[in-house]
Curated annotation (Swiss-Prot):
Cystines in this chain: none
Pathway of action: Lipid metabolism; malonyl-CoA biosynthesis; malonyl-CoA from acetyl-CoA: step 1/1
Organism: Microcystis aeruginosa (strain NIES-843 / IAM M-2473)
Entry similarity comment: Belongs to the AccD/PCCB family.
SUPFAM superfamilies: ClpP/crotonase (SSF52096)
Molecular-function GO terms, alphabetical: acetyl-CoA carboxylase activity; ATP binding; carboxyl- or carbamoyltransferase activity; zinc ion binding
Start and end residues of each CoA carboxyltransferase N-terminal domain: 29-298
Quaternary state and interactors: Acetyl-CoA carboxylase is a heterohexamer composed of biotin carboxyl carrier protein (AccB), biotin carboxylase (AccC) and two subunits each of ACCase subunit alpha (AccA) and ACCase subunit beta (AccD).
ZnF C4-type span: 33-55
GO biological process: fatty acid biosynthetic process; malonyl-CoA biosynthetic process
Protein name as annotated: Acetyl-coenzyme A carboxylase carboxyl transferase subunit beta
Recorded catalytic activity of this chain's protein: N(6)-carboxybiotinyl-L-lysyl-[protein] + acetyl-CoA = N(6)-biotinyl-L-lysyl-[protein] + malonyl-CoA
Keyword tRNA processing carried by entry: no
Subcellular location: Cytoplasm
Length: 316
């Protein structure tokens, strides 16, 4: 009997209960990297913030896990969870929009494609919005727009820096013009936040496309992207068919956008919290002055640095 036949016979005679037990034990224990194909122990992968330990591929992150990665423990205060989407257009494709919403809410446990709230990051207060691609591709509908607008307005009222983690396929087609209106709505709120001299940092993750890219994702004071994230407006195939030209390889990646000045920095996920904390700290109304030591650096007693406002007034 060949080795192949031996394994085939064993599989046929093996008790189904044992096969089921083995599948149950293995389920969720290991995660295969979609980029390099290496199997990783799921607990180790989570400890590395869902970044492949072998090739550095950044797997998609659920909003709850992203909040856990960024916000200090026991400081998260969620906002506007009671707001839920409706179906004013009675939209229907293969199934009604109302049915799609209900099914997605049951599957993900989310009310819509963004979670918003306040908290601290390394002790520094901030307002944070986290998009979740699991909810209809992270598409931007009226609830996403309303929650991000309210978050931005609260950040303005409370003089908080604002960070939005972007992950979206764009505007939600089932809401038509109501979805497209959110682009201007959020942009207006962000403009008032900017006029208050407050910091806004969008973090572009894979993917960030469509109406999100055309609005709040590109309006930051400092724009950060994760490595090898897909960032763009329309898809490559659509652009090539419209322009009738071949586009350069990788032109919608974060690396390409960094090279051409559309993003300010590419930050690996494992360094994101520390980077955000440093940027927020530097943009506080005051920050500590480091005294020289041996003509280099010395972490001495903090000193308040006087800053000049746009009107020429000096503040401390």
């Amino acid at each position: 009997m060949s080795l192949f036949d031996w394994f085939a016979n064993r599989q046929k005679t093996e008790p189904k209960v044992q096969q089921q037990q083995e599948r149950e034990i293995a389920d969720g224990l290991w995660t295969k990297c979609p980029n390099c194909g290496v199997l990783a122990y799921t607990k180790d992968l989570l400890a590395n913030q869902l970044v492949c330990l072998d090739c550095g591929h950044h797997n998609r992150v659920e909003s709850e896990e992203r909040i856990r990665q960024l916000v200090d423990a026991n400081t998260w205060n969620c906002l506007d969870e009671q707001i839920r989407p409706t179906d004013p257009l009675k939209f229907r494709d293969r199934k009604s929009y109302s049915d799609r919403l209900r099914e997605t809410q049951e599957k993900t446990g989310l009310t819509d494609a963004v979670r918003t709230g306040t908290g601290t990051i390394d002790g520094l207060p901030l307002a944070l919005g986290v998009m979740d691609f699991r909810f209809m591709g992270g598409s931007m509908g009226s609830v996403v727009g309303e929650k991000l607008c309210r978050l931005t307005e609260q950040a303005t009222d409370e003089s908080l820096p604002l960070v939005i983690i972007c992950a979206s396929g764009g505007a939600r087609m089932q809401e038509g013009m109501l979805s497209l209106m959110q682009m201007a709505k959020i942009s207006g709120a962000l403009n008032r936040h900017r006029e208050a001299k407050l910091l806004y940092i969008p973090v572009l993750t894979n993917p960030t496309t469509g109406g999100v890219t055309a609005s709040f994702a590109m309006l930051g004071d400092i724009i950060i992207a994760e490595p090898k994230a897909t960032i763009g407006f329309a898809g490559k195939r659509v652009i090539e068919q419209t322009l009738r030209e071949k586009l350069p390889e990788g032109f919608q990646t974060s690396e390409y956008l960094l090279k051409h000045g559309f993003v300010d920095a590419i930050v690996p996920r494992t360094h994101l919290k520390k980077t955000l904390a440093q940027l927020i700290s530097l943009h506080q109304p005051f920050f500590p002055l480091l005294s020289p030591l041996n003509s280099h650096h010395h972490y001495g007693q903090p000193e308040l640095i006087p800053l000049k406002t746009a009107q020429g007034q000096t503040t401390v």
